[in-house]
């Protein structure tokens, strides 16, 4: 079983406004951030944070997709296992995904709409986050 949590969220703010909050040091983009040269524009961010209750670092990967007047954000958090027999992370991946989205919404001062939320996300459930 994969311990990952996925969110698909519409942030009611322009793409520029959303990517402006992705700065070095933010827990949702402190590993990697890139805006691709595509139309519509797409950005990728990777963050890492230590969770005491999981006893491990977790990562969050985000895909940001430009829309006309809003930005779609896919947040996938995972990595709370310490060994082969760990079958739970005490909700850490869920909390990291939600915390990352909540921070983006607060920093942009935008309203956000959760379109989908997927617990125990794995490749067989990835269709649920497709747009």
Language model segments and positions:
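Terminal, regulation- and interaction-focused segments at domain boundaries
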Residues: 1-25, 105, 113-121, 126
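A short, structured loop/turn motif at beta-sheet edges
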Residues: 15, 36-38, 64-71
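Short, solvent-exposed aromatic-acidic interface loops
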Residues: 75-83
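A conserved amphipathic terminal alpha-helix motif
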Residues: 83-126
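Glycine-rich, aromatic-bearing surface loops/beta-hairpins
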Residues: 129-131
């Amino acid at each position: 079983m994969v311990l990952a949590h996925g969110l698909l969220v519409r942030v009611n703010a322009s793409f520029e406004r959303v990517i402006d909050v992705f700065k070095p040091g933010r827990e949702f983009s402190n590993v990697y951030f890139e805006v691709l040269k595509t139309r519509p524009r797409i950005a990728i961010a990777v963050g890492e944070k230590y969770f005491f209750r999981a006893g491990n670092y977790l990562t969050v990967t985000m895909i940001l997709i430009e829309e006309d007047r809003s930005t779609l954000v896919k947040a996938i958090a995972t990595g709370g296992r310490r060994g082969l027999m760990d079958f739970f992370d005490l909700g850490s991946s869920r909390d990291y995904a939600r915390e990352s989205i909540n921070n983006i919404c607060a920093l942009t001062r935008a309203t956000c709409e959760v379109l989908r939320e997927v617990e125990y996300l794995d490749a067989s459930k990835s269709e649920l986050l497709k747009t």
